[in-house]
């Protein structure tokens, strides 16, 4: 695997010098300063590429070229936004950057309720609490019909939880959910958020798939033409939330994508921390079935709690993800490619890390502190080395 590291650009508290010392050779970044939907010019791409290369690294993967909400709702200026996206892909290819991660999550990108969940060892993790989320949705956001998405027990627990929350607790929970986590391109006020949800009131899973198909049929031929590999990131968490459909959550969704546009440019980001939240997702089977189309991997683990829809981010080698079997399946896919004469390694980044040691005293991007990811990268690197030596060192 190619060892990579997500970097949020010049404002990231983790420097490129830090990234290099962590042992990564590739950088995963994006032009976050360019508004959603606008074309990334060759000039801006080359500027960022030069910064990365001057630090002795390579820009391996774009994460992400964000998709304008008009495309997802198939409204407004969606045709122009699609044309802009096509041009951005052409410009990236011209600059030699050929792997693009993206997602098709409506309104919200990845979502957590607690950004400072304290683990028994004193380090901090990200957590999604189903009851807190229900309390937000029913009692703070007051989304009409939200009760239909919860069990009677969850509704009662959410009311109880809400009753014990201080104003600061409510403000923090709201901020955590709607203000935009790292990599999310949109942050909202509560009123803006309600308005955005309203845009989806007539969009169910079938309709969102229809809109996604329009995007794929416009984008994938361009990607194929210029040699770019698109790698869709799964929904996080991988299930409908806030009454919004989610359409990249299961192996069935992956198969739908391939059936919709059967091109090798139409590929996947294997994010074990997103897919792995669902007990019915067999990660190794996903890798084996869709291995040739996996162009990027995010390796992390989560731990489901008593309510199976509640989870926290576990250490990379713990939790519900069998990291050994996952890495073995990825390495096997790389060797299969090698036997076909393809030398490309699959870029891997240690996804999220616990906030620990002196990062606890620093301002960090939630999930993206340096030391927790350094630990995760070192652990995954060790697993890969052992697998390579044990199975492939002839």
Swiss-Prot record:
Superkingdom of origin: Bacteria
GO BP field: D-glucuronate catabolic process
Signal peptide: none
EC number(s) per entry: 4.2.1.8
MF (Gene Ontology): ferrous iron binding; manganese ion binding; mannonate dehydratase activity
Alphabetized UniProt keyword annotations: Iron, Lyase, Manganese
Cofactor(s) needed: Fe(2+); Mn(2+)
Reactions that this protein is recorded to catalyse: D-mannonate = 2-dehydro-3-deoxy-D-gluconate + H2O
Pathway participation: Carbohydrate metabolism; pentose and glucuronate interconversion
Pfam families tied to this protein: UxuA (PF03786)
NCBIfam families per UniProt: PRK03906.1, uxuA
Known function: Catalyzes the dehydration of D-mannonate.
Family: Belongs to the mannonate dehydratase family.
Protein name: Mannonate dehydratase
Protein species of origin: Escherichia coli O157:H7 (strain EC4115 / EHEC)
